């Protein structure tokens, strides 16, 4: 149950009544009418912009509309007051019984409270991580993996049919570099000195690949030229790297539904088919691009190339898809891959890219818009860098030196749950500081601890109540005398719980799972605030001498626990029941 939706329904019903009474003209579009929490809680429980958005189309002053609407709303038994503010905003206060009833609603709904059907079963593809299969996942990949997986969980929670997908970049030059690097480790496995020259991958993680190559091929490859072993070693090493990446993702609690290969697009006609589709729309042509300003991109050359008219769909310049020598640009297989996703029948596509792919956003959106005839929206989320800190100092990683911090390093030091939560404590496009010491601190400044501690406190109340012989099942607590929850701090906590369904829908519509982490921190803050006030005000403690009062307060605590567990589930974090 979304209380904000319920009150919005009331507002639109009263606007309809005003139309019938001749106070408003017929045919007004009410889609922009919103009901939301006011920016300042002192102004009320909810606020609506109805009068402001209807003033111009109705030809009436906003305050006049607001005053007439306020009179009607104040007559509803759920509304204790309706006050006009400023030029025509309408602030509403709800009666305590509405808030108190929310506790029973949450307990009766259980883990379905907050779940939504706004996705209406639409098929959405979330592509994320898609790291080059050239080594173990590093800390930069961790953030993209967590954001992508949490977004997938959020969308499923809100009613979408979600597919998690990993695009294996196994068609470019980097996998040849991997093969050459692995071959040196193969030589090393035979007692020869490896030649890790400039440009190769130096990491020790390739030593087991060399050993595995030795086990499979013996010394049969040692005296052969690169042209005889490159393809086999490339496929062998790529598969071993992908197995390592799958294990890394599993350690982070991420499981993909689909792995798609870039290599599978070459020589199969898929790239040609995608470009033929664009050609049918007169979006492919031969031409020479103007020299770019600033840094020259890899795909620019001062000769005639095959170009995609991406400017027809919002890009800044047209983009090369085939070079003058007849080879494909990096963009061509990406177009084909996204065309494949479109033809698989997805209603929406989401790509999670590293911030260094920012220049790819417009061209990729243009390609999908063209290939789907505007039917399939593509949202691209850019993931900013993670800055590591340890002992108060920046902790830098160097892939070239083979000493970068891996996903496993992070998970082994702080755990999967802490890693996942911390990666969602900033919006995806903001740089995130990851302090190995602070994320394990038991303090208010550590959001992971703060939220988990709230859940542990709730469970301690439930345990003590059981020890006193109380029935603390959700079904029984839902029948408590909830009128006893009348303190402003208790009502404020319930009001925060009432925001959960609305928060879920907003986060899902905007593809922003960090909103869930932010909300959980705010909810935990309300719970801790009430708990701490109970240290000075005995009447606010969750366990009271009067069993009737106790039952009501325990019901409130349990309702908070229901929502915290639901939110942590979306983040892929296991709730902690007890702090030791």
Swiss-Prot record:
Lineage: superkingdom: Bacteria
Keyword Membrane: no
Single annotated GO MF: ATP binding
One Pfam family cited in the UniProt record for this chain: DALR_1
Keywords recorded for this protein, A-Z: Aminoacyl-tRNA synthetase, ATP-binding, Cytoplasm, Ligase, Nucleotide-binding, Protein biosynthesis
SUPFAM superfamilies tied to this protein: Anticodon-binding domain of a subclass of class I aminoacyl-tRNA synthetases, Arginyl-tRNA synthetase (ArgRS), N-terminal 'additional' domain, Nucleotidylyl transferase
Enzyme Commission code: 6.1.1.19
InterPro entries in the record: aa-tRNA-synth_I_CS (IPR001412), Arg-tRNA-ligase (IPR001278), Arg-tRNA-synth_N (IPR005148), Arg-tRNA-synth_N_sf (IPR036695), ArgRS_core (IPR035684), DALR_anticod-bd (IPR008909), Rossmann-like_a/b/a_fold (IPR014729), tRNAsynth_Ia_anticodon-bd (IPR009080)
Protein's cellular compartments: Cytoplasm
Protein's GO biological process: arginyl-tRNA aminoacylation
GO cellular component assignments: cytoplasm
Motif 'HIGH' region location, chain numbering: 131-141
PROSITE patterns: AA_TRNA_LIGASE_I
Keyword ATP-binding in annotation: yes
EC category name: ligase
Reactions accelerated catalytically: tRNA(Arg) + L-arginine + ATP = L-arginyl-tRNA(Arg) + AMP + diphosphate
NCBIfam families listed in its UniProt record: argS (TIGR00456)
Family: Belongs to the class-I aminoacyl-tRNA synthetase family.
Subunit structure, interactors included: Monomer.
Protein name: Arginine--tRNA ligase
Organism: Cereibacter sphaeroides (strain ATCC 17029 / ATH 2.4.9) (Rhodobacter sphaeroides)
């Amino acid at each position: 149950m979304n209380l904000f939706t319920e009150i919005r329904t009331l507002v639109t019903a009263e606007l309809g009544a005003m139309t019938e009474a001749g106070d408003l003209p017929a045919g007004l579009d009410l889609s922009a009418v919103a009901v939301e929490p006011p920016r300042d809680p002192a102004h009320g429980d909810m606020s609506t912009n109805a009068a402001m958005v209807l003033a111009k189309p109705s030809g009436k002053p906003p305050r006049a509309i607001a005053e007439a609407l306020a009179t009607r709303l104040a007559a509803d038994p759920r509304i204790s007051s309706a006050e006009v503010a400023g030029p025509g905003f309408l602030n509403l206060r709800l009666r305590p019984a509405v808030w108190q009833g929310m506790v029973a609603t949450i307990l009766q709904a259980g883990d379905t409270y907050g779940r939504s059907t706004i996705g209406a079963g639409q098929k959405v593809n979330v592509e994320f991580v898609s790291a080059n299969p050239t080594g173990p996942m590093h800390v930069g990949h961790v953030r993209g993996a967590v954001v992508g997986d949490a977004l997938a969980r959020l969308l499923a929670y809100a009613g979408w049919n979600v597919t998690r997908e990993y695009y294996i970049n196994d068609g470019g030059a980097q996998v040849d570099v991997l093969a050459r690097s692995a071959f040196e480790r193969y030589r090393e496995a035979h007692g020869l000195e490896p030649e890790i020259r400039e440009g190769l991958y130096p990491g020790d993680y390739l030593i087991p690949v060399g050993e595995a190559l030795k086990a499979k091929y013996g010394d049969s490859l040692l005296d052969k030229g690169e042209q005889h072993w490159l393809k086999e070693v490339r496929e062998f090493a790529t598969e071993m790297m992908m197995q390592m990446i799958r294990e890394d993702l599993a350690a982070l609690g991420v499981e993909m539904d689909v792995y798609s290969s870039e290599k599978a697009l070459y020589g199969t006609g898929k790239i040609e088919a995608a470009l033929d589709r664009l050609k049918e729309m007169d979006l492919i042509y031969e031409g020479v691009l103007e020299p770019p300003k600033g840094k020259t991109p890899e795909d620019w050359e001062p000769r005639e190339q095959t170009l995609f008219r991406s400017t027809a769909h919002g890009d800044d310049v047209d983009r090369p898809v085939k070079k003058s020598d007849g080879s494909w640009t990096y963009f061509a297989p990406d177009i084909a891959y996204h065309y494949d996703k479109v033809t698989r029948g997805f209603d929406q596509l989401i790509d999670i890219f590293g911030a260094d792919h920012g220049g790819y956003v417009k061209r990729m959106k243009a390609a999908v818009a063209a290939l789907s005839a505007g039917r399939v929206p593509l949202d691209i989320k850019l993931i900013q860098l993670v800055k590591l800190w340890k002992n108060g100092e920046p902790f830098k990683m160097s892939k070239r030196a083979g000493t970068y911090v891996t996903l496993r390093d992070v998970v082994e030091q702080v755990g999967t749950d802490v890693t996942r939560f911390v990666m969602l404590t900033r919006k995806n496009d903001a740089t995130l500081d990851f302090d190995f010491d602070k994320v394990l601190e038991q303090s208010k400044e550590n959001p992971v601890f703060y939220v988990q501690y709230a859940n542990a406190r709730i469970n301690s109340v439930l345990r003590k109540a059981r020890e006193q012989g109380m029935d603390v099942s959700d079904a029984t607590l839902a029948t408590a005398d909830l009128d006893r929850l009348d303190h402003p701090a208790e009502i404020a906590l319930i009001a925060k719980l009432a925001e959960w369904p609305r928060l879920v829908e907003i986060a899902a519509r905007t593809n922003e799972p960090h909103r869930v982490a932010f909300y959980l921190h705010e909810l935990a803050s309300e719970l801790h605030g009430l708990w701490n006030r109970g240290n000075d005000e005995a009447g606010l403690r969750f366990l009271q001498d009067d069993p009737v009062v106790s039952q009501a307060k325990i019901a409130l605590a349990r309702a908070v626990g229901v929502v915290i567990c639901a939110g942590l589930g979306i983040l892929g974090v296991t709730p902690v029941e007890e702090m030791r």
